[in-house]
A protein has these predicted regions:
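Bacterial Sec-dependent N-terminal signal peptides
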Residues: 1-21
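Phosphate/dinucleotide-binding and metal-coordinating scaffold of catalytic cores
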Residues: 19-174
Length: 174
């Protein structure tokens, strides 16, 4: 009986944490994200940073579901799904790159996966859904990405595992 009570209490505490996560990652909504790069040759610049192994970012403005943020930093995300030969590469977007504390609903980093190895577009979002039932895990949903006014495609939008994630899920960033 004691063990059952402990299980119910800890499960309830965990579920409360999960339910309080940002509505930004609700799976019943496809987010709309517009990136407007400062430079016309943004793809060449990002390809160059990637090939050279540089950790730098290039500047863009971003509109997320109608809210606009300026001077965000953009780079490619990851390694295995990035290629200078792909038109649709994954993106890591830092909202507070130049403007301190700039965020969208408390989120300061967007991670857009290109889903290049998942033709169903289901695996990543579904696996995070399952994981969150048993342990802390990132939230994920979908976003249509527009670049300089052109629809670039459907991406998965995955919550970054950063200090905010650690504090929300474990009470400390350490």
């Amino acid at each position: 009986m004691f063990i059952r009570c402990i299980f119910l209490i800890t499960t309830g505490l965990y579920l409360t944490t999960v339910l309080s996560q940002s509505v930004f990652y609700e799976t019943d909504t496809i987010r709309e994200i517009h990136l407007d790069f400062y430079d016309e040759n943004w793809d060449y610049l990002l390809d160059s940073l990637y090939v050279e192994g540089e950790g730098g970012r290039i500047l863009a403005n971003i509109e997320i579901d109608g809210s606009t943020y300026y001077s965000v930093g953009v780079r490619y995300k990851g390694y295995s799904s990035v290629s200078v030969n792909y038109a649709k590469n994954p993106f890591n977007i830092k909202l507070d790159y130049l403007i301190e504390d700039q965020n969208h609903e408390g989120i300061d980093k967007l991670k857009l996966s290109n889903v290049i190895q998942d033709p169903s577009f289901l695996r990543e979002v579904l696996s995070y859904e399952v994981c969150r039932k048993y342990m802390p895990a990132s939230n994920a949903n979908y976003a249509n990405l527009y670049i300089d006014g052109v629809l670039w495609g459907l991406y998965t939008n995955v919550q970054a595992v950063n200090k905010e994630f650690l504090i929300d899920n474990f009470g400390s960033k350490y």
